[in-house]
Curated annotation (Swiss-Prot):
Mg(2+) 1 binds at D416, D460. This is Adenylate cyclase type 8. One of its GO terms (cellular component) is postsynaptic density. The keyword Ion transport does not apply. Changing Q1198A: Does not affect calcium activated adenylate cyclase. Does not affect calcium activated adenylate cyclase. Decreases calcium/calmodulin stimulated adenylate cyclase activity. Has an elevated basal activity. Has an elevated basal activity. Mg(2+) 2 binds at D416, V417, D460. The lineage of its organism: Eukaryota, Metazoa, Chordata, Craniata, Vertebrata.
Length: 1248
């Protein structure tokens, strides 16, 4: 059978959604939302996962995230997994103190579902979760269906051989069990007959009968033993062969009975039992079962005609037997086909569940990769370990935290590409981005070889640190070697591209603080006085040389020749702070010797003539950004032994995870090996009644639509027709009452069929179709129809006995088939009342979805009625038949044999019903669990999209997620009209200090985090939705407007530039508000410019979105040459903004490094504010903001915890989800422990 969602005329929500809940409260639209603790917000997000997933029936549309500020969490976990809530696991030993600071959490924007932060809504497209293939995509032949009624076909298999093999293996245990039960039932019947014979028979048993009885019993016992003992080696094919052997044994017994060597009369009842068992209990394909059923029927009819002792007395009796066997074969075909269909449906649901869980793992892997594209592994490990140990009762006491690490004895390298500005004007966008990606990919490779950690790429600036996170005694040597290799590489670039480029490198040794600040566009960074010195060493250096400080020289221990650097002469900072500098002396021939990998590529490509931007075409080529995150192959990195010690045990599992049919099939094989169905049954289903232990789950199951209910009812109607035909061939002596009664029964059953299939006939009245729909969707109504159908068939089987006249029963003993006296009154053949009663019992088996306990109750009532009729009211009819037609060798009368036959059918039908109901309920459980996994997957996808939007603009994220990028170029884009803003805090350098009072600078960074977070919050207002934050550089905030493709064709061409100007004004107001609360006097120095830029994504391991061009350099210079507390713009920008309602003050002409050399001094203006409001800009209204990095990492931890909880349930409670499914690797693969890292700070309250 198939259990499907409701799809009635008026529609309905999916019934297997466990707890539909009302939508969460919205966050409101105030200009300043209430601040939240990130732990509280993330706990709310976690608890709302299923609420969002089930809202709207779990449809595939976009979903709005609720604002946790509006209301507290309202936990509605699915009942199926409600028992799986386990406490979080602590690390045990090895915990370290963590530094804390202030970050804020705000939910994602509403109104556009998964809309990106920069315009352009819609799903970013991580996974199309609701596009799973339908059953017809799997089946080779799904059967013939007409008006909702499914008719059997001979072939019912999957298209895929592997899928068919897995299906056969999946239900091998159940079919093995059915084979054993069938043989045991037959053996018990034989033993019962043997005991009755020994007790009741007047004469001893014929030796040949005893031998045959023992032989057939032995065969069936051996089959049972082989199937039970050798179950691990019993394949599906061998099980089919054992079924054939069982059928041969039973059919041979029919032959023996026909020859007079059986224990039951003429054996017609045993033939019916054999036919039913062949179709419903023996593990035979439908084609084999049909051939076996026809063979058994033909054998019995032949014996009845040819064997003298069994000779029938009329053609009507022969036809009645033929119709009887036809009816049993027809019902058996329906039962076998629809049962197999139900099992295949359950198997597909199992596969979908496994597939959903596999895809959930893939989503987790993507999320981990996204985190690792922002943070180094050791920081992620620190956050995960800390968050894993967060207890619910402590969440309320956790204040804003940041994760800042302090590392001593490190060396910092800054490198800048000289001549890059001119290069960016001569290359196309694609060539520029390709060149940068290849260049920085080589730098990343060199950094790995020289034990350096790349921190960030700032335009054409690259900086890295050695000694972080693993302390190294040779950190200074590593940076110097890194610098020398970079110079060799850039010189190779210069020789290949014919562009005048070089490297200016500065190195300083000391200590750093590292971590992530802000709420948007997370980027790992380092801060300290020593970082500033390294930066100034680079800017005051000489192209092609390595400029080092005295501190670095001391760490080199004289291993390199140096000369005076005279950095004070080239840089004001170095002169002001009296920093001694040196230049590494390196023989020119050493610099001309290229790195080994470049030499190999150059040799292999020596015949190339290429003066373009691409300089690497050899065997090595840089990876494309995000290929390891959103690519098709999602393989995980292995955990090192040291890194495993840093993770909680349940997060350090290792399993190679792939996606695709092969991996799904492997998972299903694991499921089969662990006999998951039996485990699910023990956990969720009651032993005898098979009802769910969870009442709400039972209610949902009972309301599931039964797609084969119409087919079952049609089959029951066919059985009634056969019963009518049998009793018409052997009619009652009173034809008129019999004709009336069967006419009424047929009309009643026809009405039942009509009322249950009416919804497929549009020509019928609407009220009738709605009634039909209601019946199909209502458990009680379906049961009423089922019981009415069974009652009609039962009445058809027994009602004719009411017209029998005891005085007119005629002896048939001495008549032959050719006798002139033909007696066709059914009262002369009372056993046919029993045979048709058996057909009525089989009607119960036809209704696959009927509860097995109800089936048992109905069967017991039938047997009780038959016992009443045969043993009391109509006992004389059966006794008269036995006296006249049975020999003295028959130790059982027709009454007793009939009750024994019905008892056999009762057990067989009940067991078959139990198997079918278990299959249906297992199917339902898999659906519920798969639905839960898909809902959780959707939440994870939203998490991933949030993370990706915090790395890339929304339209760029969609570029990487929606397209087939197998052969795609790097992402690059040219823009003609973009606004660029740099906002720095000049006073923060003087404010920053590394003393014991401020925890070695940590408290200063805590304040900087608050400032950046407030700036990020402003971007959550819809008036600034055209603005994208690019990065923070120390205490400098960089933002851009006009990047969204959707806004490029907007009528208000410079509306985004006006929004950028408004944003800069809002920043000045925000910093003033911060000054009030922190008792500081910070001022912003802001520079704005506009023009053309090149945007692109570079870096494979740590992808980074950036923009380049003269406009960027000019905006940066507008900041660096500006005045604190003022907003400086060039004349071109002034001319645009002055017509948009902004007021300015002319500053004058200033010298701008890198631009004035070619264009002379630049006229600049100070932006004062707005003269008049812009009518196109709405009043400030806060959109739900972004999740903080801590929030997303905690979401990842809680997702992994939920998986671990399910795994523990599977191991301890045998929940039936494959054990190996959750034994998975994580991406958190650090190089080793961090004994040199000092985690700074503790939890502290907000700043005053």
């Amino acid at each position: 059978m198939e259990l499907s969602d409701v799809h009635c005329l008026s529609g309905s929500e999916e019934l297997y959604t466990i707890h539909p809940t009302p939508p969460a409260a919205d966050g409101g639209s105030g200009s300043r939302p209430q601040r939240l603790l990130w732990q509280t917000a993330v706990r709310h997000i976690t608890e709302q996962r299923f609420i969002h997933g089930h809202r709207g029936g779990g449809g595939g549309g976009s979903r709005k995230a609720s604002n946790p500020a509006g209301s507290g969490p309202n936990h509605h976990a699915p009942q199926l997994s409600s028992d799986s809530v386990l406490p979080l696991y602590s690390l045990g030993s090895g915990e370290r103190a963590h530094n804390t600071g202030g970050t804020k959490v705000f939910p994602e924007r509403s109104g556009s579902g998964s809309a990106s932060g920069s315009g352009g809504g819609g799903d970013l497209g991580f996974l199309h979760l609701d596009c799973a293939p339908s059953n017809s995509d799997f089946f080779l032949n799904g059967g013939y269906s007409y008006r909702g009624v499914i008719f059997p076909t001979l072939r019912n298999s999957f298209k895929s051989r592997d899928l068919e093999r897995l299906y056969q293996r999946y239900f091998l245990g159940q079919r093995r069990k059915s084979e054993v039960v069938m043989n045991v039932l037959d053996v018990l019947t034989k033993l019962t007959l043997l005991v009755l014979h020994l007790s009741l028979a007047s004469a001893p048993m014929d030796p040949l009968k005893g031998i045959l009885l023992g032989f057939f019993t032995g065969i069936e016992v051996v089959i049972c033993a082989l199937v039970v003992v050798r179950k691990d080696t019993t394949s599906h094919t061998y099980l089919q062969y054992s079924g054939v052997v069982t059928w041969v044994a039973m059919t041979t017994q029919i032959l023996a009975a026909g020859l007079g060597y059986g224990l039951l009369g003429d054996g017609i009842g045993y033939v019916l039992f054999t036919l039913f068992a062949t179709y419903s209990m023996l593990p035979l394909p439908l084609t084999w079962a049909i051939l076996a059923g026809l063979g058994t029927s033909l054998l019995q009819v032949t014996l009845q005609v040819l064997i003298p002792r069994l000779a029938v007395f009329s053609i009507n009796q022969v036809l009645a037997q033929v119709v009887l066997f036809m009816c049993m074969n027809t019902a058996g075909i329906f039962i076998s086909y629809l049962s197999d269909r139900a099992q295949r449906q359950a198997f597909l649901e199992t596969r979908r569940c496994v597939e959903a869980r596999l895809r959930l793992e893939t989503e987790n892997q993507r999320q981990e990769r996204l985190v690792l594209s922002v943070l180094p592994r050791f920081v992620v490990l620190e956050m995960i370990n800390d968050m894993t140990n967060v207890e619910d009762e402590h969440l309320q006491h956790q204040f804003h935290r940041i994760y800042i690490h302090r590392y001593e004895n490190v060396s910092i390298l800054f490198a800048d590409v000289k001549g890059f500005t001119n290069l960016s004007t001569t290359l196309s966008a694609q060539e520029l981005v390709r060149m940068l990606n290849e260049l920085f990919a080589r730098f990343d490779r060199l950094a790995h070889e020289h034990h350096c950690l790349r921190i960030k790429i700032l335009g054409d600036c690259y900086y890295c640190v050695s000694g972080l996170p693993e302390p190294r005694q040779d950190h200074a040597h590593c940076c110097v070697e890194m610098g020398l290799s970079m110079i060799k590489t850039i010189r190779f670039v210069r020789s290949r591209t014919k562009h005048d480029v070089d490297m200016r490198i500065g190195i300083h040794s000391g200590s750093v603080l590292c971590g992530v600040l802000g709420l948007r566009k997370w980027q790992f960074d380092v801060w300290s006085w020593d970082v500033d010195i390294a930066n100034k060493l680079e800017s005051g250096g000489i192209p092609g040389r390595i400029h080092i400080s005295k501190a670095t020289l001391d760490c080199l221990s004289g291993d390199y020749n140096v000369e005076e650097g005279h950095g004070k002469e080239r840089n004001e900072f170095l002169r002001k702070h009296n920093i001694e500098t040196y230049l590494i002396k390196q023989p020119e021939e050493s610099l001309l010797s290229l790195p080994e990998d470049i030499v190999k590529e150059s040799v292999s490509c020596s015949d190339r003539r290429n003066s373009g931007a691409t300089f690497t075409e050899g065997s090595w080529s840089p990876e494309l950004p995000f290929d390891n995150i959103v690519g098709k192959q999602n393989t995980l990195a292995a955990l090192t032994r040291n890194s495993i010690n840093l993770l909680p045990n349940h997060l350090a599992q290792a399993l190679h995870v792939q996606s695709g049919p092969e991996e799904i099939n492997k998972r299903i094989e694991h499921t089969i090996d662990l006999r998951s169905g039996d485990k699910l049954r023990r956990e969720h289903i009651k032993p005898f009644s098979l009802m769910f232990k969870d009442s709400s789950l039972e209610h949902k199951y009972s309301q599931m639509r039964d797609e084969v209910f119409k087919s079952n009812l049609v089959c029951a109607f066919i059985v009634l027709l056969f019963i009518t035909a049998i009793q018409s061939l052997l009619p009652s002596s009173r034809l008129m009452p019999m004709t009336i009664q069967f006419s009424i029964l047929i009309m009643l059953h026809s009405a039942l069929v009509l009322i249950t299939t009416a919804e497929d006939y549009k020509c019928l009245p609407l009220i009738l179709r709605k009634t039909c729909c209601w019946i199909n969707e209502t458990y009680l109504a379906r049961n009423v129809i089922i019981f009415a159908s069974i009652l009609i068939n039962f009445l058809g089987a027994v009602i004719n006995i009411l017209w029998c006249d005891f005085d007119k029963s005629i002896p048939l003993k001495n008549l032959t088939f050719n006798s002139s006296a033909v007696f066709t009154d059914i009262c002369s053949y009372p056993e046919y009342f029993v045979f048709t009663g058996v057909l009525a019992m089989v009607t119960c088996a036809v209704f696959l979805r009927l509860n097995s306990v109800l089936k048992l109750a109905v069967l017991l009532i039938m047997i009780a009625i038959y016992a009443l009729l045969t043993e009391t009211i109509y006992a004389g009819l059966f006794l008269s038949y036995d006296n006249l037609n049975h020999s003295g060798e028959d130790f059982l009368g027709t009454k007793e044999a009939s009750l024994l036959l019905m008892a056999m059918f009762l057990l067989a039908v009940f067991y078959h019903g139990q198997q079918l109901e278990y299959t249906a309920r297992l199917d339902f459980l898999w659906r519920v669990q798969a639905k839960e996994e898909i809902n959780e997957m959707k939440d994870l996808r939203e998490h991933n999209e949030n993370m990706l939007r915090n790395i890339l603009p929304g339209h760029v994220a969609r570029h990487f997620l929606e397209k087939d990028r197998d052969n795609e170029e790097l992402y690059s884009q040219s823009y003609d009209a973009v606004g660029v803003m740099f906002a720095s805090i000049p006073g923060f350098a003087d404010f920053y200090s590394q003393t014991e009072m401020n925890n070695q600078g940590v408290e200063c960074l805590r304040l900087l985090n608050e400032i950046i977070a407030d700036f990020d919050e402003l971007l959550g207002e819809d008036r600034f939705q055209d603005i994208e934050k690019i990065k923070t550089i120390g205490s400098t905030y960089m933002a851009v407007s006009g990047l969204s493709p959707e806004k490029q064709q907007c009528e208000d061409k410079w509306g985004h530039l006006c929004a950028l100007a408004d944003f800069s004004l809002a920043l000045t107001e925000s910093i003033q508000e911060i000054n009030k609360h922190s008792f500081n006097n910070f001022e912003l120095r802001i520079g704005i410019s506009h023009g053309s830029v090149v945007a692109g994504v570079i870096g494979a391991k740590k992808p980074q979105y950036d923009i380049w061009g003269k406009t960027v350099n000019l905006a940066s210079r507008m900041d660096s040459t500006g005045v604190s507390g003022r907003i400086q713009v060039p004349e071109e920008t002034y001319l645009i903004l002055k017509d948009q309602g902004f007021a300015f003050d002319y500053r004058g002409e200033i010298y701008v490094k890198g631009i004035s050399e070619q264009e002379g001094k630049i006229k600049t203006y100070f932006l004062l504010g707005r003269v008049q409001p812009n009518p196109f800009i709405l009043p400030p209204r806060r959109l739900p903001g972004q999740y903080s990095l801590a929030a997303v990492v905690l979401g990842l931890v809680q997702s992994l915890n939920r998986q671990r909880q399910k795994q523990l349930l599977n191991e301890n409670s045998n929940s039936g989800i494959i054990k190996s499914h959750y034994n998975r690797r994580t991406l958190l693969t650090p190089s080793g422990p961090e004994p040199g890292a000092q985690a700074e700070g503790t939890d502290k309250s907000d700043l005053p």
